[in-house]
Regions:
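A short helix-to-beta-strand connector/capping loop
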Residues: 8, 117, 141-147, 160-163, ...
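Structured loop/turn residues at beta-strand edges in well-structured enzyme cores
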Residues: 88, 101, 117, 144, ...
Length: 298
């Protein structure tokens, strides 16, 4: 983490922490959505990160959400200062998968809006094929607003001399593409980013080992517990509950080496109640909720 007055040259900045529907969610008037409508501090944007290398004046976006215009404002001050007021186009975008909260912001880089020029988009082979062969995304490729760069899971890519990223596959609903997670490495520290996964048991890796190998972990926290789904078939939920993840990762959290935050929060999530038992439990167990604007120094 960074605090006011600290100097950090390589950062991961959290730009969005909600599930794909955002908070408030369209057409929903639950207490969490109503609270967000009445008080902007409870608004949450769709899932996204920025990777900032201030030494190289480079900025990369992880997942182009439909809130990308607002999310640019969260990096504007740092990057405008670093870039000498140049046009604030990212140096690349990395995509996890083809669900609406994670890639549809690409449309704003097209002819009708920012009109980017060969903006590198890093993604899996299947994701790249989806973009190239389906409109309106194929127009971005045709007009060379974006340039697709395929990621090979398990292989590092170098974004700047001080930043590298390793992608890996995770199990998830893969209607149009497969799903990736990322390890983002700076010169000193590393971040694990898994906003979507079917379950930790369904993965062919040990989540405890993966978390303990990094300094920060931003993990799928879509739902807090089965209480959000009375009468529902829990096998169809498709995300690990925060309560389950905390039970799995409690020994890791107690060690204190890795800071663990939950992100990708659904509007129904019990942890969104600032005075509720869920957020108290999360905090008392040594975990946290990711917040827009939060910076992780690498």
């Amino acid at each position: 983490m960074t605090t006011r007055g600290q100097k950090a040259d390589i950062l991961v900045k959290v730009l969005g922490t909600a599930q794909d529907g955002g908070i408030p969610q369209i057409g929903c008037y639950c207490k969490n959505c109503q609270r967000a409508r009445q008080d902007p501090q409870f608004l949450r944007l769709r899932p996204s990160l920025a990777i900032l290398d201030l030494n190289e004046t480079k900025m990369f976006i992880v997942d182009a959400s439909p809130d990308i215009s607002l999310q640019y404002d969260l990096v504007h001050e740092r990057m405008e200062r670093a870039r000498n007021h140049k046009k604030n186009v990212p140096d690349g975008i990395l995509l996890t998968h083809a669900h609406i909260g994670h890639y549809t912001g690409l449309m704003f880089y097209g002819y009708e809006a920012l009109s980017a020029d060969k903006l590198p988009v890093y993604c899996s082979k299947r994701m790249g094929e989806f973009l190239a062969n389906n409109g309106p995304w194929s127009q971005l490729v045709k007009y060379q607003n974006i340039s697709i760069h395929l990621l090979e899971p398990g292989t590092d890519i170098t974004l700047t001399p001080g930043v590298s990223v390793t992608s890996f596959r995770v199990p998830h609903r893969d209607e149009y593409s497969d799903t990736l997670g990322f390890v983002i490495a700076g010169q000193k520290k590393r971040v694990l980013y898994i906003p979507d996964i079917q379950s930790w048991k369904a993965w062919d890796r040990d989540i405890r080992e993966e978390v303990e190998s990094v300094d920060f972990a931003l993990l799928d926290g879509t739902f807090y517990s089965p209480e959000e789904f009375p009468g529902r078939d829990l096998s169809r939920i498709g995300h690990p509950f925060i309560s389950t993840s905390m039970e799995t990762l409690r020994p890791t959290a107690k060690k204190g080496k890795t800071k663990i935050y939950f992100t990708h929060l659904n509007h129904s999530n019990l942890a969104l109640d600032p005075g509720g038992d869920a957020i108290k439990h999360i905090t008392n167990e040594g975990f946290g909720l990711a917040q827009e604007g939060m910076e992780l120094s690498l």
